[in-house]
Amino acid sequence: MREYLTEHIKQALHKASIPASRAIKIEKPSDSRFGDFSTNIALVLAGECGMNPRQLAQKITENLSFSETTVSKTEIAGPGFINFYLEPAFIMKQVEQIITSSDRFGRGAAGEGKNAIVEYVSANPTGPLTIGRGRGGVLGDCIANILEAHGYTVTREYYFNDAGRQMSILSESVRLRYIELCGIAVEFPETHYQGDYIREIAAAILEKHGEKLVESDSTELFKQTAETHIFTHIKNTLHRLDITHDSYFNEHRLYQEDESGISPNQQVIDALRQKGFIDHYDGATWFMTTRLGQEKDKVLVKSSGEPSYRLPDIAYHVTKFERGFDEIVNIFGADHIDEYPDVIEALKILGYDTDRIRVAINQFVTTTVNGETVKMSTRKGNADLLDDLIDDVGADATRLFFIMRSKDSHLNFDIDLAKKQSKDNPVFYLQYAHARICSLLRIAENEAGFSLEEGSADAHLMGKLTSAHEIQLGFTLLDYPDVIQTCARILEPQKMVEYLHSVAELYHRFYQECPILKADPDIRSARLILSLATRQVLRNGFRILGISAPKSM
Protein backbone atom coordinates (compact mmCIF):
# COMPACT_ATOMS: atom_id res chain seq x y z
CA MET A 1 0.00 0.00 0.00
CA ARG A 2 2.84 2.40 0.75
CA GLU A 3 4.17 1.96 -2.78
CA TYR A 4 0.68 2.49 -4.20
CA LEU A 5 0.18 5.75 -2.29
CA THR A 6 3.72 6.95 -3.00
CA GLU A 7 3.26 6.49 -6.73
CA HIS A 8 -0.02 8.42 -6.73
CA ILE A 9 1.55 11.26 -4.72
CA LYS A 10 4.40 11.45 -7.25
CA GLN A 11 1.86 11.70 -10.06
CA ALA A 12 -0.01 14.44 -8.18
CA LEU A 13 3.21 16.42 -7.66
CA HIS A 14 4.00 16.10 -11.35
CA LYS A 15 0.52 17.29 -12.35
CA ALA A 16 0.83 20.26 -10.00
CA SER A 17 4.32 21.09 -11.36
CA ILE A 18 5.82 20.63 -7.89
CA PRO A 19 9.38 19.24 -7.98
CA ALA A 20 9.61 16.03 -5.95
CA SER A 21 13.09 16.72 -4.59
CA ARG A 22 12.60 14.85 -1.31
CA ALA A 23 11.70 11.28 -0.45
CA ILE A 24 8.00 10.68 0.15
CA LYS A 25 7.37 9.07 3.52
CA ILE A 26 4.15 7.21 4.17
CA GLU A 27 3.43 6.43 7.82
CA LYS A 28 0.64 4.72 9.74
CA PRO A 29 -0.91 7.13 12.27
CA SER A 30 -0.85 5.85 15.84
CA ASP A 31 -4.51 6.89 16.10
CA SER A 32 -6.80 5.38 13.46
CA ARG A 33 -8.98 8.51 13.61
CA PHE A 34 -6.30 10.17 11.51
CA GLY A 35 -6.59 7.69 8.67
CA ASP A 36 -4.98 4.45 7.64
CA PHE A 37 -1.90 6.18 6.23
CA SER A 38 -0.47 9.68 6.37
CA THR A 39 2.28 11.72 4.68
CA ASN A 40 4.10 14.90 5.67
CA ILE A 41 5.32 15.63 2.14
CA ALA A 42 3.60 19.05 2.08
CA LEU A 43 5.47 20.06 5.24
CA VAL A 44 8.75 18.82 3.77
CA LEU A 45 8.40 20.62 0.42
CA ALA A 46 6.71 23.82 1.63
CA GLY A 47 9.96 25.74 2.16
CA GLU A 48 11.33 24.88 -1.27
CA CYS A 49 8.04 25.79 -2.93
CA GLY A 50 7.60 29.00 -0.95
CA MET A 51 4.09 27.97 0.05
CA ASN A 52 2.16 27.50 3.27
CA PRO A 53 2.17 23.74 4.05
CA ARG A 54 -1.62 23.51 4.18
CA GLN A 55 -1.94 25.33 0.87
CA LEU A 56 0.60 22.97 -0.66
CA ALA A 57 -1.26 19.99 0.81
CA GLN A 58 -4.46 21.30 -0.77
CA LYS A 59 -2.75 21.57 -4.14
CA ILE A 60 -1.45 18.02 -3.87
CA THR A 61 -4.81 16.53 -2.87
CA GLU A 62 -6.56 18.33 -5.73
CA ASN A 63 -4.30 16.44 -8.14
CA LEU A 64 -4.65 13.04 -6.51
CA SER A 65 -6.77 10.58 -8.47
CA PHE A 66 -7.71 7.44 -6.61
CA SER A 67 -10.32 4.89 -7.53
CA GLU A 68 -13.33 5.07 -5.22
CA THR A 69 -12.85 1.37 -4.55
CA THR A 70 -9.39 1.94 -3.05
CA VAL A 71 -9.21 5.24 -1.14
CA SER A 72 -12.51 6.39 0.32
CA LYS A 73 -11.32 9.75 1.67
CA THR A 74 -8.34 12.09 1.68
CA GLU A 75 -8.11 14.92 4.19
CA ILE A 76 -5.68 17.61 5.30
CA ALA A 77 -4.94 17.71 9.02
CA GLY A 78 -2.95 19.86 11.41
CA PRO A 79 -0.17 21.97 9.92
CA GLY A 80 -0.29 20.14 6.59
CA PHE A 81 -0.45 16.38 6.97
CA ILE A 82 -2.35 14.47 4.29
CA ASN A 83 -4.34 11.54 5.68
CA PHE A 84 -5.66 8.66 3.61
CA TYR A 85 -8.63 6.45 4.47
CA LEU A 86 -8.77 3.15 2.59
CA GLU A 87 -11.89 1.31 1.52
CA PRO A 88 -12.32 -1.69 3.85
CA ALA A 89 -13.22 -3.95 0.92
CA PHE A 90 -10.02 -2.93 -0.85
CA ILE A 91 -7.96 -3.75 2.25
CA MET A 92 -9.51 -7.18 2.60
CA LYS A 93 -9.08 -8.08 -1.06
CA GLN A 94 -5.34 -7.47 -0.72
CA VAL A 95 -5.15 -10.33 1.77
CA GLU A 96 -5.26 -12.77 -1.15
CA GLN A 97 -1.67 -11.81 -2.05
CA ILE A 98 -0.50 -13.27 1.26
CA ILE A 99 -1.80 -16.69 0.27
CA THR A 100 -0.61 -16.55 -3.33
CA SER A 101 2.85 -15.33 -2.27
CA SER A 102 3.04 -18.00 0.45
CA ASP A 103 6.57 -18.24 1.91
CA ARG A 104 7.66 -15.35 -0.32
CA PHE A 105 5.23 -12.88 1.25
CA GLY A 106 7.15 -10.05 2.86
CA ARG A 107 10.39 -10.70 1.04
CA GLY A 108 11.88 -7.47 -0.29
CA ALA A 109 14.28 -6.51 -3.05
CA ALA A 110 16.25 -3.72 -1.36
CA GLY A 111 19.27 -5.99 -0.93
CA GLU A 112 19.15 -7.70 -4.32
CA GLY A 113 22.60 -7.94 -5.86
CA LYS A 114 24.25 -7.03 -2.54
CA ASN A 115 26.34 -9.21 -0.26
CA ALA A 116 26.19 -8.90 3.51
CA ILE A 117 28.31 -10.53 6.17
CA VAL A 118 26.90 -11.01 9.65
CA GLU A 119 29.42 -11.93 12.32
CA TYR A 120 27.97 -13.34 15.51
CA VAL A 121 28.77 -15.49 18.53
CA SER A 122 32.58 -15.46 17.91
CA ALA A 123 33.17 -16.76 21.43
CA ASN A 124 36.70 -17.71 22.44
CA PRO A 125 37.10 -21.52 22.26
CA THR A 126 38.06 -21.58 25.93
CA GLY A 127 34.88 -23.00 27.42
CA PRO A 128 31.18 -23.81 26.92
CA LEU A 129 28.89 -21.07 25.66
CA THR A 130 27.35 -18.79 28.23
CA ILE A 131 23.83 -17.41 28.19
CA GLY A 132 25.17 -13.98 27.25
CA ARG A 133 26.80 -15.41 24.13
CA GLY A 134 23.56 -17.22 23.40
CA ARG A 135 21.63 -13.97 23.24
CA GLY A 136 24.13 -12.59 20.73
CA GLY A 137 23.92 -15.80 18.72
CA VAL A 138 20.14 -15.70 18.43
CA LEU A 139 20.22 -11.97 17.67
CA GLY A 140 22.77 -12.50 14.90
CA ASP A 141 20.91 -15.46 13.43
CA CYS A 142 17.64 -13.49 13.33
CA ILE A 143 19.34 -10.46 11.76
CA ALA A 144 20.86 -12.71 9.09
CA ASN A 145 17.36 -14.11 8.41
CA ILE A 146 15.96 -10.59 8.19
CA LEU A 147 18.60 -9.43 5.72
CA GLU A 148 18.00 -12.51 3.57
CA ALA A 149 14.29 -11.72 3.56
CA HIS A 150 15.27 -8.20 2.51
CA GLY A 151 17.01 -9.57 -0.58
CA TYR A 152 20.64 -9.74 0.55
CA THR A 153 22.95 -12.65 -0.07
CA VAL A 154 24.17 -13.27 3.47
CA THR A 155 27.34 -14.89 4.78
CA ARG A 156 27.11 -15.95 8.42
CA GLU A 157 30.56 -15.88 9.97
CA TYR A 158 32.14 -16.96 13.24
CA TYR A 159 35.42 -15.22 14.17
CA PHE A 160 37.42 -17.99 15.81
CA ASN A 161 39.75 -16.52 18.43
CA ASP A 162 42.41 -19.23 18.36
CA ALA A 163 45.39 -16.99 19.14
CA GLY A 164 46.52 -14.82 22.01
CA ARG A 165 46.94 -15.09 25.75
CA GLN A 166 43.61 -16.78 26.55
CA MET A 167 44.51 -19.76 24.38
CA SER A 168 47.87 -20.02 26.16
CA ILE A 169 46.08 -20.03 29.52
CA LEU A 170 43.68 -22.69 28.22
CA SER A 171 46.47 -25.02 27.10
CA GLU A 172 48.35 -24.54 30.37
CA SER A 173 45.13 -25.23 32.33
CA VAL A 174 44.67 -28.55 30.53
CA ARG A 175 48.36 -29.46 30.95
CA LEU A 176 48.24 -28.87 34.70
CA ARG A 177 45.06 -30.96 35.08
CA TYR A 178 46.70 -33.69 33.00
CA ILE A 179 49.72 -33.72 35.30
CA GLU A 180 47.37 -33.78 38.27
CA LEU A 181 45.55 -36.82 36.85
CA CYS A 182 48.93 -38.52 36.54
CA GLY A 183 49.15 -38.38 40.33
CA ILE A 184 51.47 -35.41 40.62
CA ALA A 185 50.47 -32.52 42.87
CA VAL A 186 50.35 -29.15 41.10
CA GLU A 187 49.58 -25.61 42.10
CA PHE A 188 46.64 -24.56 39.93
CA PRO A 189 46.43 -20.75 39.55
CA GLU A 190 43.09 -19.06 40.19
CA THR A 191 43.55 -17.17 36.90
CA HIS A 192 43.36 -20.44 34.95
CA TYR A 193 40.18 -22.13 33.68
CA GLN A 194 38.50 -23.97 36.54
CA GLY A 195 35.64 -25.87 34.93
CA ASP A 196 35.12 -29.62 35.00
CA TYR A 197 35.41 -29.59 31.21
CA ILE A 198 39.16 -28.92 31.63
CA ARG A 199 39.50 -32.17 33.58
CA GLU A 200 37.46 -34.00 30.94
CA ILE A 201 39.83 -32.83 28.19
CA ALA A 202 42.86 -33.73 30.30
CA ALA A 203 41.39 -37.19 30.96
CA ALA A 204 40.91 -37.75 27.22
CA ILE A 205 44.56 -36.85 26.60
CA LEU A 206 45.68 -39.19 29.38
CA GLU A 207 43.62 -42.03 27.94
CA LYS A 208 45.11 -41.55 24.47
CA HIS A 209 48.74 -40.73 25.29
CA GLY A 210 49.27 -42.14 28.74
CA GLU A 211 51.69 -40.37 31.08
CA LYS A 212 54.42 -39.75 28.51
CA LEU A 213 53.58 -36.02 28.20
CA VAL A 214 54.33 -35.21 31.84
CA GLU A 215 57.91 -34.18 31.11
CA SER A 216 57.07 -32.42 27.82
CA ASP A 217 57.64 -28.66 27.66
CA SER A 218 55.31 -28.26 24.67
CA THR A 219 51.70 -27.24 25.21
CA GLU A 220 50.69 -27.46 21.54
CA LEU A 221 49.00 -30.86 21.84
CA PHE A 222 47.08 -29.64 24.89
CA LYS A 223 46.03 -26.51 23.00
CA GLN A 224 44.91 -28.34 19.87
CA THR A 225 43.01 -31.02 21.80
CA ALA A 226 41.26 -28.46 24.00
CA GLU A 227 40.43 -26.24 21.04
CA THR A 228 38.92 -29.11 19.04
CA HIS A 229 36.97 -30.46 22.02
CA ILE A 230 35.56 -27.10 23.09
CA PHE A 231 34.70 -25.84 19.62
CA THR A 232 32.90 -29.07 18.80
CA HIS A 233 30.87 -28.55 21.97
CA ILE A 234 30.17 -24.91 21.01
CA LYS A 235 28.89 -25.93 17.57
CA ASN A 236 26.72 -28.65 19.08
CA THR A 237 25.19 -26.13 21.49
CA LEU A 238 24.47 -23.69 18.66
CA HIS A 239 22.97 -26.51 16.60
CA ARG A 240 20.44 -27.08 19.39
CA LEU A 241 19.20 -23.53 18.72
CA ASP A 242 19.38 -24.06 14.94
CA ILE A 243 22.19 -21.51 14.71
CA THR A 244 24.61 -22.18 11.88
CA HIS A 245 27.52 -20.42 10.21
CA ASP A 246 28.70 -20.46 6.61
CA SER A 247 32.33 -19.69 7.41
CA TYR A 248 34.79 -19.67 10.29
CA PHE A 249 37.58 -17.12 10.22
CA ASN A 250 40.55 -18.22 12.34
CA GLU A 251 42.35 -15.42 14.16
CA HIS A 252 45.73 -17.08 13.64
CA ARG A 253 45.50 -16.17 9.94
CA LEU A 254 46.08 -12.56 10.97
CA TYR A 255 49.44 -13.55 12.45
CA GLN A 256 50.63 -15.50 9.42
CA GLU A 257 53.19 -13.80 7.20
CA ASP A 258 52.74 -13.56 3.43
CA GLU A 259 55.44 -14.03 0.79
CA SER A 260 56.99 -10.70 1.74
CA GLY A 261 57.17 -11.70 5.40
CA ILE A 262 54.41 -9.35 6.60
CA SER A 263 51.32 -10.47 8.51
CA PRO A 264 47.90 -8.77 8.21
CA ASN A 265 48.40 -7.42 11.74
CA GLN A 266 51.72 -5.89 10.75
CA GLN A 267 50.19 -4.47 7.57
CA VAL A 268 47.71 -2.55 9.73
CA ILE A 269 50.50 -1.13 11.89
CA ASP A 270 52.55 -0.16 8.83
CA ALA A 271 49.56 1.52 7.15
CA LEU A 272 48.64 3.47 10.30
CA ARG A 273 52.29 4.48 10.70
CA GLN A 274 52.30 5.90 7.18
CA LYS A 275 49.26 7.96 8.15
CA GLY A 276 51.07 9.25 11.25
CA PHE A 277 48.97 7.38 13.81
CA ILE A 278 51.53 4.98 15.32
CA ASP A 279 53.88 5.70 18.19
CA HIS A 280 56.19 3.56 20.33
CA TYR A 281 56.73 4.21 24.01
CA ASP A 282 56.82 2.27 27.29
CA GLY A 283 57.94 -0.70 25.20
CA ALA A 284 54.56 -0.90 23.43
CA THR A 285 53.08 0.08 20.05
CA TRP A 286 50.29 2.64 20.31
CA PHE A 287 47.42 3.80 18.11
CA MET A 288 47.57 7.58 18.52
CA THR A 289 43.89 8.19 19.20
CA THR A 290 44.82 11.39 21.03
CA ARG A 291 45.18 12.85 17.54
CA LEU A 292 41.47 12.10 17.13
CA GLY A 293 40.56 14.04 20.25
CA GLN A 294 40.57 11.13 22.70
CA GLU A 295 42.19 11.48 26.11
CA LYS A 296 44.53 8.50 25.76
CA ASP A 297 46.27 6.56 23.02
CA LYS A 298 45.27 2.89 22.67
CA VAL A 299 47.78 0.07 22.80
CA LEU A 300 47.99 -2.20 19.74
CA VAL A 301 50.98 -4.30 20.78
CA LYS A 302 51.81 -4.70 24.46
CA SER A 303 55.34 -4.49 25.85
CA SER A 304 55.28 -8.30 26.02
CA GLY A 305 54.91 -8.40 22.24
CA GLU A 306 51.33 -9.68 22.47
CA PRO A 307 48.76 -7.77 20.38
CA SER A 308 45.79 -6.24 22.16
CA TYR A 309 42.30 -7.16 20.95
CA ARG A 310 42.17 -4.01 18.84
CA LEU A 311 44.92 -4.94 16.39
CA PRO A 312 43.55 -8.28 15.12
CA ASP A 313 40.03 -6.82 15.15
CA ILE A 314 41.16 -4.03 12.81
CA ALA A 315 43.00 -6.51 10.57
CA TYR A 316 39.99 -8.83 10.54
CA HIS A 317 37.69 -6.01 9.42
CA VAL A 318 40.13 -5.15 6.64
CA THR A 319 39.57 -8.67 5.30
CA LYS A 320 35.82 -8.09 5.31
CA PHE A 321 36.27 -5.07 3.05
CA GLU A 322 38.76 -6.93 0.85
CA ARG A 323 36.26 -9.76 0.42
CA GLY A 324 33.87 -7.26 -1.15
CA PHE A 325 30.93 -7.22 1.24
CA ASP A 326 28.48 -4.38 0.68
CA GLU A 327 27.13 -4.56 4.22
CA ILE A 328 29.19 -5.55 7.26
CA VAL A 329 27.15 -6.37 10.36
CA ASN A 330 28.78 -7.10 13.70
CA ILE A 331 26.90 -8.51 16.69
CA PHE A 332 28.82 -7.62 19.83
CA GLY A 333 28.23 -8.04 23.53
CA ALA A 334 28.14 -5.06 25.84
CA ASP A 335 31.79 -5.73 26.73
CA HIS A 336 32.78 -4.43 23.26
CA ILE A 337 31.21 -0.99 23.68
CA ASP A 338 34.52 0.70 24.50
CA GLU A 339 36.60 -1.15 21.93
CA TYR A 340 34.79 -1.13 18.60
CA PRO A 341 34.79 2.69 18.10
CA ASP A 342 38.61 2.53 17.94
CA VAL A 343 38.36 -0.16 15.26
CA ILE A 344 36.02 2.08 13.25
CA GLU A 345 38.38 5.06 13.60
CA ALA A 346 41.35 3.00 12.42
CA LEU A 347 39.43 1.77 9.38
CA LYS A 348 38.45 5.35 8.50
CA ILE A 349 42.11 6.39 8.65
CA LEU A 350 42.98 3.48 6.37
CA GLY A 351 40.46 4.76 3.82
CA TYR A 352 37.65 2.25 4.19
CA ASP A 353 33.99 3.23 3.89
CA THR A 354 32.88 2.62 7.47
CA ASP A 355 29.31 3.58 6.59
CA ARG A 356 29.07 0.00 5.35
CA ILE A 357 29.63 -1.24 8.91
CA ARG A 358 26.66 -1.65 11.23
CA VAL A 359 27.10 -2.71 14.83
CA ALA A 360 24.43 -4.27 17.03
CA ILE A 361 25.27 -4.36 20.73
CA ASN A 362 23.29 -6.78 22.88
CA GLN A 363 23.10 -6.14 26.59
CA PHE A 364 23.62 -8.59 29.43
CA VAL A 365 21.26 -11.37 30.51
CA THR A 366 20.27 -12.48 34.00
CA THR A 367 18.10 -15.49 34.78
CA THR A 368 15.47 -15.53 37.52
CA VAL A 369 13.39 -18.19 39.27
CA ASN A 370 10.64 -17.10 41.66
CA GLY A 371 11.82 -13.56 41.14
CA GLU A 372 15.34 -14.26 42.35
CA THR A 373 18.51 -14.23 40.25
CA VAL A 374 19.98 -17.70 39.72
CA LYS A 375 22.92 -19.31 37.94
CA MET A 376 22.07 -21.74 35.16
CA SER A 377 24.92 -24.15 35.90
CA THR A 378 25.71 -26.88 38.37
CA ARG A 379 29.27 -27.24 37.04
CA LYS A 380 32.00 -25.60 39.08
CA GLY A 381 33.90 -22.92 37.24
CA ASN A 382 31.15 -22.10 34.78
CA ALA A 383 28.35 -19.60 35.26
CA ASP A 384 25.13 -19.34 33.30
CA LEU A 385 25.71 -22.03 30.69
CA LEU A 386 23.56 -21.90 27.57
CA ASP A 387 23.12 -25.69 27.42
CA ASP A 388 21.58 -25.69 30.88
CA LEU A 389 19.08 -23.02 29.87
CA ILE A 390 18.06 -24.96 26.75
CA ASP A 391 17.69 -28.12 28.85
CA ASP A 392 15.39 -26.26 31.22
CA VAL A 393 13.07 -24.29 28.92
CA GLY A 394 13.64 -25.65 25.40
CA ALA A 395 15.03 -24.14 22.21
CA ASP A 396 11.95 -22.13 21.14
CA ALA A 397 11.59 -20.37 24.48
CA THR A 398 15.32 -19.72 24.65
CA ARG A 399 15.33 -18.10 21.22
CA LEU A 400 12.21 -15.99 21.64
CA PHE A 401 12.99 -14.78 25.14
CA PHE A 402 16.44 -13.64 24.01
CA ILE A 403 14.92 -11.28 21.44
CA MET A 404 11.58 -10.28 22.95
CA ARG A 405 13.26 -7.25 24.50
CA SER A 406 15.26 -4.64 22.61
CA LYS A 407 18.88 -5.64 22.14
CA ASP A 408 19.80 -2.36 23.85
CA SER A 409 18.01 -3.40 27.05
CA HIS A 410 19.23 -5.64 29.82
CA LEU A 411 17.27 -8.91 29.64
CA ASN A 412 15.74 -10.54 32.68
CA PHE A 413 15.10 -14.13 31.54
CA ASP A 414 12.20 -15.37 33.66
CA ILE A 415 12.60 -19.16 33.78
CA ASP A 416 9.19 -19.69 35.37
CA LEU A 417 7.44 -17.71 32.65
CA ALA A 418 9.34 -19.48 29.87
CA LYS A 419 8.05 -22.85 31.11
CA LYS A 420 4.40 -21.82 31.52
CA GLN A 421 1.84 -23.42 29.21
CA SER A 422 -0.44 -20.40 29.19
CA LYS A 423 -1.09 -17.18 27.31
CA ASP A 424 1.22 -15.37 29.75
CA ASN A 425 4.14 -17.10 28.06
CA PRO A 426 4.78 -15.20 24.78
CA VAL A 427 6.09 -18.35 23.05
CA PHE A 428 3.00 -20.35 23.97
CA TYR A 429 0.76 -17.43 22.99
CA LEU A 430 2.25 -17.14 19.50
CA GLN A 431 2.46 -20.85 18.78
CA TYR A 432 -1.04 -21.46 20.10
CA ALA A 433 -2.42 -19.02 17.53
CA HIS A 434 -0.75 -21.02 14.75
CA ALA A 435 -1.92 -24.35 16.18
CA ARG A 436 -5.47 -23.02 16.61
CA ILE A 437 -5.62 -22.06 12.92
CA CYS A 438 -4.24 -25.45 11.85
CA SER A 439 -6.91 -27.17 13.92
CA LEU A 440 -9.63 -24.96 12.44
CA LEU A 441 -8.49 -25.67 8.89
CA ARG A 442 -8.39 -29.42 9.51
CA ILE A 443 -11.99 -29.31 10.71
CA ALA A 444 -13.00 -27.11 7.78
CA GLU A 445 -11.41 -29.49 5.30
CA ASN A 446 -12.97 -32.58 6.85
CA GLU A 447 -16.44 -31.16 7.46
CA ALA A 448 -16.89 -28.51 4.78
CA GLY A 449 -14.47 -29.60 2.09
CA PHE A 450 -12.55 -26.32 2.27
CA SER A 451 -9.09 -26.33 0.70
CA LEU A 452 -6.37 -23.84 -0.05
CA GLU A 453 -7.08 -24.00 -3.77
CA GLU A 454 -10.76 -23.24 -3.27
CA GLY A 455 -9.90 -20.45 -0.87
CA SER A 456 -7.63 -18.82 -3.41
CA ALA A 457 -10.29 -19.12 -6.11
CA ASP A 458 -12.87 -17.45 -3.88
CA ALA A 459 -10.62 -14.60 -2.78
CA HIS A 460 -13.06 -12.03 -4.19
CA LEU A 461 -15.31 -12.95 -1.28
CA MET A 462 -12.92 -11.13 1.05
CA GLY A 463 -14.77 -7.92 0.25
CA LYS A 464 -17.73 -9.33 2.16
CA LEU A 465 -15.83 -9.10 5.45
CA THR A 466 -16.81 -5.79 7.02
CA SER A 467 -16.55 -6.12 10.80
CA ALA A 468 -13.94 -4.12 12.67
CA HIS A 469 -12.24 -7.30 13.93
CA GLU A 470 -11.86 -8.67 10.41
CA ILE A 471 -10.65 -5.44 8.86
CA GLN A 472 -8.15 -4.72 11.63
CA LEU A 473 -6.70 -8.23 11.36
CA GLY A 474 -6.48 -8.05 7.56
CA PHE A 475 -4.89 -4.60 7.65
CA THR A 476 -2.34 -5.75 10.22
CA LEU A 477 -1.41 -8.83 8.18
CA LEU A 478 -0.60 -6.58 5.24
CA ASP A 479 1.92 -4.73 7.45
CA TYR A 480 4.28 -7.72 7.43
CA PRO A 481 6.54 -6.49 4.57
CA ASP A 482 6.92 -3.11 6.30
CA VAL A 483 7.90 -4.86 9.53
CA ILE A 484 10.64 -6.73 7.66
CA GLN A 485 11.91 -3.39 6.32
CA THR A 486 11.89 -1.84 9.78
CA CYS A 487 13.74 -4.79 11.30
CA ALA A 488 16.36 -4.61 8.54
CA ARG A 489 16.79 -0.85 8.93
CA ILE A 490 17.36 -0.89 12.69
CA LEU A 491 18.70 -4.46 13.10
CA GLU A 492 16.07 -5.24 15.69
CA PRO A 493 14.17 -8.57 15.55
CA GLN A 494 12.25 -7.53 18.66
CA LYS A 495 9.99 -5.51 16.33
CA MET A 496 9.01 -8.78 14.66
CA VAL A 497 8.16 -10.31 18.03
CA GLU A 498 5.95 -7.32 18.86
CA TYR A 499 4.25 -7.50 15.48
CA LEU A 500 3.56 -11.25 15.64
CA HIS A 501 2.15 -10.83 19.14
CA SER A 502 -0.29 -8.23 17.79
CA VAL A 503 -1.25 -10.58 14.93
CA ALA A 504 -1.90 -13.41 17.38
CA GLU A 505 -3.89 -11.12 19.66
CA LEU A 506 -6.04 -9.85 16.80
CA TYR A 507 -6.63 -13.38 15.52
CA HIS A 508 -7.68 -14.70 18.93
CA ARG A 509 -10.12 -11.78 19.19
CA PHE A 510 -11.43 -12.37 15.64
CA TYR A 511 -11.83 -16.08 16.41
CA GLN A 512 -13.92 -15.30 19.49
CA GLU A 513 -16.09 -12.59 17.94
CA CYS A 514 -16.64 -13.85 14.37
CA PRO A 515 -18.16 -17.33 13.95
CA ILE A 516 -16.33 -19.18 11.21
CA LEU A 517 -17.54 -22.72 10.56
CA LYS A 518 -21.18 -21.90 11.38
CA ALA A 519 -21.30 -18.78 9.20
CA ASP A 520 -23.04 -18.59 5.82
CA PRO A 521 -20.98 -20.30 3.08
CA ASP A 522 -19.54 -17.13 1.52
CA ILE A 523 -18.63 -15.57 4.87
CA ARG A 524 -17.27 -18.90 6.09
CA SER A 525 -14.98 -19.16 3.06
CA ALA A 526 -13.81 -15.57 3.45
CA ARG A 527 -13.06 -16.04 7.15
CA LEU A 528 -11.18 -19.25 6.42
CA ILE A 529 -9.12 -17.37 3.83
CA LEU A 530 -8.36 -14.73 6.46
CA SER A 531 -7.31 -17.54 8.81
CA LEU A 532 -5.08 -19.03 6.12
CA ALA A 533 -3.44 -15.66 5.58
CA THR A 534 -2.88 -15.27 9.31
CA ARG A 535 -1.25 -18.68 9.50
CA GLN A 536 1.04 -17.78 6.61
CA VAL A 537 2.18 -14.54 8.22
CA LEU A 538 2.81 -16.31 11.52
CA ARG A 539 4.81 -19.02 9.73
CA ASN A 540 6.90 -16.51 7.83
CA GLY A 541 7.56 -14.56 11.00
CA PHE A 542 8.41 -17.70 12.97
CA ARG A 543 10.94 -18.56 10.26
CA ILE A 544 12.61 -15.18 10.76
CA LEU A 545 12.76 -15.74 14.52
CA GLY A 546 13.85 -19.36 14.18
CA ILE A 547 11.03 -20.89 16.23
CA SER A 548 8.84 -23.85 15.30
CA ALA A 549 5.27 -23.61 14.02
CA PRO A 550 3.37 -26.46 15.72
CA LYS A 551 0.23 -27.77 14.06
CA SER A 552 -1.25 -28.86 17.37
CA MET A 553 -0.71 -28.10 21.05
UniProtKB/Swiss-Prot annotation:
The keyword Aminoacyl-tRNA synthetase applies. HAMAP family: Arg_tRNA_synth. GO terms for molecular function: arginine-tRNA ligase activity; ATP binding. It catalyses: tRNA(Arg) + L-arginine + ATP = L-arginyl-tRNA(Arg) + AMP + diphosphate. Its EC number is 6.1.1.19. Belongs to the class-I aminoacyl-tRNA synthetase family. The lineage of its organism: Bacteria, Pseudomonadati, Chlorobiota, Chlorobiia, Chlorobiales. One of its GO terms (cellular component) is cytoplasm. It is found in: Cytoplasm. It comes from Chlorobium phaeobacteroides (strain BS1). InterPro entries: Arg-tRNA-ligase, Arg-tRNA-synth_N, Arg-tRNA-synth_N_sf, ArgRS_core, DALR_anticod-bd, Rossmann-like_a/b/a_fold, tRNAsynth_Ia_anticodon-bd. Its main location: cytoplasm. Pfam families: Arg_tRNA_synt_N, DALR_1, tRNA-synt_1d. Monomer. GO terms for biological process: arginyl-tRNA aminoacylation. This is Arginine--tRNA ligase. A motif ('HIGH' region) lies at residues 123-133. CDD domains: ArgRS_core. Keywords: Aminoacyl-tRNA synthetase, ATP-binding, Cytoplasm, Ligase, Nucleotide-binding, Protein biosynthesis. The keyword Signal does not apply.
